Amino acid sequence: MNVFWFIPTHGDSRYLGTSQGARAADYDYFRQIAVAADTLGYEGVLLPTGRSCEDAWVVASSLIPATQRLKFLVAIRPGIASPGLSARMAATFDRLSGGRLLINVVTGGDAAELEGDGLFVDHDTRYEITDEFLRIWRGLLTSAHHGESVEFIGRHLKSKGGKLLYPPVQSPHPPLWFGGSSPAAHEMAGEHIDTYLTWGEPPEAVAEKIADIRARAAQHGRTIRFGIRLHVIVRETEDEAWAAADKLISKLDDDTVARAQEAFAKMDSEGQRRMAALHGGKRGSRKELEIYPNLWAGVGLVRGGAGTALVGNAEQVAARMREYAELGIETFILSGYPHLEESYRFAELVFPLLPGRQRANANGPLSGPFGEIVGNHYAPKASQS
């Protein structure tokens, strides 16, 4: 079970939908979160992409020297950037980071934003472009290890004598991750992707996705890994966790929710449509927003993309994670508001319940991350949880 955290380059706060409780989203803050994730034992971090965020490549590159082991899941954008340029960026990042790059393939689901970036095509055409993009991108990085070039002629993209002179550290290329819920997305994942990511839907829906993509991958003679993107609100007691969930959306008003849902409705993203269907665009009680035990849809009232959170005490959150793991989920990409404090809270409360998640400390047990020396002489007692 791999656990990732999240760098909130689109902003961070204690509340959704208001400037109250907000904090500056700047380099110093991003660095604090990255260092915390690296120190606490998270496998990696996801950096979001799009016009609502600081550029993921620039931010991730700036965090390489601040971290030692942390992997960076960074987006490539078929149709917006060329496959050749994207391949060179990936190879350089992978070399400078010592092989710590993971690639998030983002086709995009917001037509207005894509048109602002110069891409004027429909949903399925975007996936045709993504398919051709990945054939060139993968070819360039794979061929770089052998000094070879790439020739490709597609309907949308071409490469004549494409070549990389500096191969990536990882062979044949940094792993490809991707999330998408339409049939076109599933087919593309089955043919090209190493790890498929789903947003946090109830287990039954996730199981259906996994089965479909596994079958599509098998048709191409491939196997594929799976991950899930969720928020998390964990506290020592269940009541405290649900109180924190209520507090997170306590500043929302109906107008803010309506404007957010109106914007989401204009997108042609099947994943975003499925997220919206979980809450119906209305603020409701815990009973109405808890769509499965400990799975809460309140975040998606105003946040695009991943809109659900695991809510509960540590045992409940760990139990839900194990339930998803039994379906085939290997990686959990998590976040919580505010992201710095919640990275510590999740690690302190839940990592001990997930075997193998506490990273060994090279300096010995007394310098471990959890606990202060007692009476200037003794290490604190090990937790019995």
Curated annotation (Swiss-Prot):
Catalytic reaction annotation: an alkanesulfonate + FMNH2 + O2 = an aldehyde + FMN + sulfite + H2O + 2 H(+)
Keyword Flavoprotein: yes
Entry function: Catalyzes the desulfonation of aliphatic sulfonates.
PANTHER family linked: ALKANESULFONATE MONOOXYGENASE (PTHR42847), ALKANESULFONATE MONOOXYGENASE-RELATED (PTHR42847:SF4)
UniProt EC number: 1.14.14.5
Protein name, per record: Alkanesulfonate monooxygenase
Gene Ontology molecular function, alphabetical: alkanesulfonate monooxygenase activity
InterPro entries recorded: Alkanesulphonate_mOase_FMN-dep, Luciferase-like_dom, Luciferase-like_sf, SsuD_RutA_monooxygenase
Family assignment from sequence similarity: Belongs to the SsuD family.
Native source species: Paraburkholderia phymatum (strain DSM 17167 / CIP 108236 / LMG 21445 / STM815) (Burkholderia phymatum)
Matches recorded under SUPFAM superfamilies: Bacterial luciferase-like
